[in-house]
Amino acid sequence: MKGFKLSCTASNSNRSTPACSPILRKRSRSPTPQNQDGDTMVEKGSDHSSDKSPSTPEQGVQRSCSSQSGRSGGKNSKKSQSWYNVLSPTYKQRNEDFRKLFKQLPDTERLIVDYSCALQRDILLQGRLYLSENWICFYSNIFRWETLLTVRLKDICSMTKEKTARLIPNAIQVCTDSEKHFFTSFGARDRTYMMMFRLWQNALLEKPLCPKELWHFVHQCYGNELGLTSDDEDYVPPDDDFNTMGYCEEIPIEENEVNDSSSKSSIETKPDASPQLPKKSITNSTLTSTGSSEAPVSFDGLPLEEEVMEGDGSLEKELAIDNIIGEKIEIMAPVTSPSLDFNDNEDIPTELSDSSDTHDEGEVQAFYEDLSGRQYVNEVFNFSVDKLYDLLFTNSPFLRDFMEQRRFSDIIFHPWKKEENGNQSRVILYTITLTNPLAPKTATVRETQTMYKASQESECYVIDAEVLTHDVPYHDYFYTINRYTLTRVARNKSRLRVSTELRYRKQPWGFVKTFIEKNFWSGLEDYFRHLETELTKTESTYLAEIHRQSPKEKASKSSAVRRRKRPHAHLRVPHLEEVMSPVTTPTDEDVGHRIKHVAGSTQTRHIPEDTPDGFHLQSVSKLLLVISCVICFSLVLLVVLNMMLFYKLWMLEYTTQTLTAWQGLRLQERLPQSQTEWAQLLESQQKYHDTELQKWREIIKSSVLLLDQMKDSLINLQNGIRSRDYTAESDEKRNRYH
């Protein structure tokens, strides 16, 4: 079942910001990666009910398998799932609750997503916010005090992000002409606001969602397991690369016929090609597994091919010789074009041959765009596109050495199978070594590789890989998609682009999501830097071998591989070397400047300058380290304070016990039963009585002594006062007589 979930997984849209208004929308007419074959299913009551949205065979298998597994579970499975459904209801149950709660809404309204939040009135009413195509609804039930609110999207005049108590950024305010509704306590305020804003703009522009688009958002919010049954006939599975709002156009039949005819003609013109795909299309695309297998933690590896390419060394020498000698001959060739478009772009082909069989008219554009996650590799190598394909996707010495460095083991390759839409896919199982301390030492990986039928030999290869990593933390929450794009730049130059995307089966918590993404992106960055470094070393080795060869061997090789007309001396363009100087081949010094990491989920692009992602990650790591140290210090301080408090309590209890009577004199809880026990009790009581009498005697004796001392002191005081009075009287008498 895991192999079929890719087609129903939502990809991030390039319209995830309010700045991308539907007015500025452009409808893409590029072919989708997955062929549209199969039965059609139309949403009931939709304005696009006449449009037919075909579902892929994989998606049909997914629904049938889920329904069969649901029926075959038996009573035990129903009993075991009942409690889980109560705690985590499926999308179908939520949609039924939505229709029961808001019966006044039209029957055509289908729930798209619901969020837990609170509505601010006299008090905060905790409940759930329901979003449909044309309505915003809220329901709260607090001790049987129900609150229902419905707002038509067309009636909304403003929608803003707000802060609760002017401090906490977790609120959204929706204003109509007469009312204001303040929703707060959102767990993911920005994501909720983006969804509400999209639906609001579509409602204002009167552009309803087509069935594919609606179910795309449902899958994006609820995952793949929707709990649907065969009774839900309005289900329309979205396309694999459905990532834009308003994309409801179908590709014209003429374009499909042209593509089919072109692919057929390419097959017929190549007698060595496979009946399924062009010759290089059926080669096992092995490297696709390597990058994506590093999520969510930093683990390495690369699977190995079973097939062996014979004569690989001679082919490498011939292509490298052809590259060097061909460029020298082309500098002397006449320029047939009236003008040359030279600039600082390093991706411009350097060959100017007038031969029509070399197809060097320019760089080939890939038939599919990069994924919307991050782009890790965007590099031009001095290999032909077929040679680069052989290095990366066959059992070449380069691949074996790289595998040994990445430490892969237990590799199992399943054979390629041709799908009904013309693509080819296979499953690879292998074991990787993990270095993250929070994960096990090893983990098993299941990878499903898909080579699209539009891939052509000597032109372009596009390979996608869906990677499921088991035995790692939260492995059931996410999976990864890697897209490898190999395009021809010149006859012996090709471009390798690798883009990755992290997709979620279930929406994790904020902390869990941060943990997954941190390990995922760091592992991929390390892997792809290593891959590009090894490719650059291999390229330098090939060029060095060419320079060591003799001139005669070079001449013989060049004449056998490539024949060109030598121009006359009077037809040579003057200063052609100076004109060609800006067009240079990639060097080792440029490697560090060509790997650009484009963060974000809206778009993937090539940035000409270095981004401070490494510094930012380092700063974040230092900040986390400081926070961890502060937390540890606080915990140690709390432990010390608790120990001091315990010591004081223990001393207080000990002091209290010393102030009480002897433990042996206390009345026991159990009364004496025998005469001996009574005698012991009386004896102890007598001792206690004697002790108390002795204490009182000592106290009384001490009191008597103190009283005697006090008496003596008072007598002395009295005598002193009398003597002073007598002296004063005698002095007074003397004064009288004199």
From Swiss-Prot:
UniProt free text on domains: GRAM domain binds phosphatidylserine in the PM and mediates protein recruitment to endoplasmic reticulum-plasma membrane contact sites (EPCS) in response to excess cholesterol in the PM. VASt (VAD1 Analog of StAR-related lipid transfer) domain, also known as ASTER (Greek for star) domain is a sterol-binding domain.
Q: Which domain of life is it from?
A: Eukaryota
Q: How does it sit in the membrane?
A: Single-pass membrane protein
- Looking at the Swiss-Prot or TrEMBL record, what is one Pfam family this protein matches? GRAM
Cleaved signal peptide residues: none
Query: Which lineage do the record's taxonomy fields give for this organism?
Result: Eukaryota, Metazoa, Chordata, Craniata, Vertebrata
Region spans: Disordered: 1-81, 254-299
**Domain (VASt): residue spans on this chain:** 372-543
**UniProtKB keywords:** Cell membrane, Endoplasmic reticulum, Lipid transport, Lipid-binding, Membrane, Phosphoprotein, Transmembrane, Transmembrane helix, Transport
- One term under GO cellular component: plasma membrane
**Record-linked PANTHER family:** GRAM DOMAIN CONTAINING 1B, ISOFORM E, PROTEIN ASTER-B
Q: What residue stretches are annotated with the GRAM domain?
A: 96-163
Q: Which CDD domains match?
A: PH-GRAM_GRAMDC (cd13220)
List the source organism.
Answer: Mus musculus
Biased composition range(s): Low complexity: 59-70
Q: Does the keyword Transmembrane apply?
A: yes
Gene3D superfamilies in alphabetical order? Pleckstrin-homology domain (PH domain)/Phosphotyrosine-binding domain (PTB)
- Function of this protein? Cholesterol transporter that mediates non-vesicular transport of cholesterol from the plasma membrane (PM) to the endoplasmic reticulum (ER). Contains unique domains for binding cholesterol and the PM, thereby serving as a molecular bridge for the transfer of cholesterol from the PM to the ER. Plays a crucial role in cholesterol homeostasis in the adrenal gland and has the unique ability to localize to the PM based on the level of membrane cholesterol.
What does the UniProt entry report for the null mutant?
A: Mice exhibit deficiency in adrenal cholesterol ester storage and steroidogenesis.
Mind telling me what this protein is named?
Protein Aster-B
Q: Its Gene Ontology biological processes? A: cellular response to cholesterol; cholesterol homeostasis
Q: Where is the composition biased (Basic and acidic residues)?
A: 41-51
Query: What does the tissue specificity note say?
Result: Highly expressed in the adrenal gland (at protein level) and brain. Also found in the kidney, testis and macrophages.
* Composition bias type Polar residues, residue spans: 8-19, 259-268, 281-295
